[in-house]
Amino acid sequence: MPTGTIILIVSIVIILIIAYVACLIVRKRNDNLLVALEERKEELFNLPVNEEVETVKALHLIGQSQVSFREWNQKWVDLSLNSFADIENHIFEAEGYNNAFRFVSAKNAIDSIDSQIDLIEEDIASIRQGLMELKEQEEKNSGRVKHALNLFDSLQEAVRENPDSYGETLSELEKQLKNIEVEFSEFVMLNSSGDPIEASEILDKTEEHMIALNQIMDRIPSLIERVTKDFPEQLEDLESGYRKLVEQNYLFTEANIESQFQNIRVSIRENTALIVSFDLDAAEAENEGIQAKIDHLYKVFNREIEANKEAVKISKNLPKFLEHVVQNTQLLDEESQRLNATYLLADSKLSRINQLKARLESIEIVVTESVEDIENPQVAYSILEERLDHSLASLKEIEEEQLVLADYLKSQELSENTARKKATLYINKLHTLKRYMEKRNLPGIPAEFLTNFFRTSDHVEALIAELDYKRINIEVVNRMLENATYDMNQLEELAYLIVQNATLTEQLLQYSNRYRSFDESVQKAFNRSLSIFEKDFDYQAAFEEISFALETVEPGVTERFVRSYEKTREAIRY
């Protein structure tokens, strides 16, 4: 057999083998796909749809919910009886095509089965979702109805067990509860007749009515209690208290008390009507207004009661205090007249004493009338208390001013005595200072000292002359005494300084002898200092001249002499 023929035969055999192997591979793949599709079908078929259908069926749905359930149930029946059977047949056909190596037909059949299963999967998902929604909606509706019924029962129970808490609103509340009961009946009828949408709307409206009524019923008892109990009790208490106060001769700053009682009664009746009409916000606001009116009257009465107590308390001591202040003013007046003969008293002080007398006369009238009015008042006690308080404050103010005026009058004689004693003392001091300076054996008295001495002497003599007037002006005397005292102190300090400078100059001049023989600057300073000392009598300049020269040759010498002098300085003995 030719080689070419052998090669051809071998090639054909190889191709056939390859083709056969390829066919086996394709068939195996298709088998796997068909197995997977079969498994998907079984998974879908085994889903608990039947159980879910039975669960929803057991709810005994009505109306539109029942129609929806029937549609989902029928769809599931169609799927379970027809669609799954069709898929089973198609899988069987595809297996036949695959076993017969009709791969194109098998591929088309497999794709078709896959699409069918996808559609069934979607349908089952929608069926289950629909069933779940029906179940949830039914549970929700059932819960809503149960909650609404419970709320309705609680409202009825509240009205039944506490009718007094709702007062005149009871009939209106019962009417509203009857309307809600009718709405419930309408809801049940519509729901049973298969109109759940309209029934749901009725239930929504019923719930809104019950919630609103519940809120109203929560607020009514406190409002009713105030208009039927609290306010009437407070008003009765006010009227009773008012009658007692009037019997005790109380008067009031407000003349329309009884008309205010009547206005409060009218407000209570009007507010009751607001509560009955369920205008509760307005009723609460009106309640606050009524309470404010009642509180105002309590405040008025309490104010008069407290004012009476305070007025009685003040009246016990005020007349005595007034008498005390009047006596003090009389004493001030008498003392001012006595002193005015000897002293020139300030017109402002005398005028103020007269003003206090006039002011006390008016206060005395007010106090007398007010104290008498306490037993048989002609005005409200609050007015009496205000008058007495004002009078008491005025008397305290006057008393403080009296103390100031008394100190002023007392100071006249004290100031005169002080001035006379100091004038005598200053005369003696001048003589002593004069003798003190003369005993120093100074070459001469500095002009500054003489000027201060004669000025001080003139001031003291002027002070003595002022004290010799028939009527002394103490203000002028005090100013002159102040000037004389200042001059006297200055003169004394100047005397000490002059004597100190003169003494130290003499000591330093003597001490300079140890340097004059060999130090020309010390000799010159000695000559200048001695000349100033003996001719100019400027002891300060003489001291500075010699001390400067000695400090040059012996630092610290001046300070040593000064310290020594201060320890042994002779004091002026007056």
From Swiss-Prot:
Extracellular side: 1-7
Location in the cell: Cell membrane
Acetylation keyword on record: no
Protein name: Septation ring formation regulator EzrA
Family of the protein in this entry: Belongs to the EzrA family.
Pfam families xref list: EzrA
InterPro entries (UniProt xref): EzrA (IPR010379)
GO cellular component, one term: plasma membrane
Gene Ontology BP terms: division septum assembly; septin ring assembly
Role according to the record: Negative regulator of FtsZ ring formation; modulates the frequency and position of FtsZ ring formation. Inhibits FtsZ ring formation at polar sites. Interacts either with FtsZ or with one of its binding partners to promote depolymerization.
Signal peptide, first to last residue: none
Membrane topology of this protein: Single-pass membrane protein
Key words of the record: Cell cycle, Cell division, Cell membrane, Coiled coil, Membrane, Septation, Transmembrane, Transmembrane helix
TM segment ranges: 8-26
Predominant localisation class: membrane
Stretches assigned to coiled coil: 105-189
Cytoplasmic side: 27-574
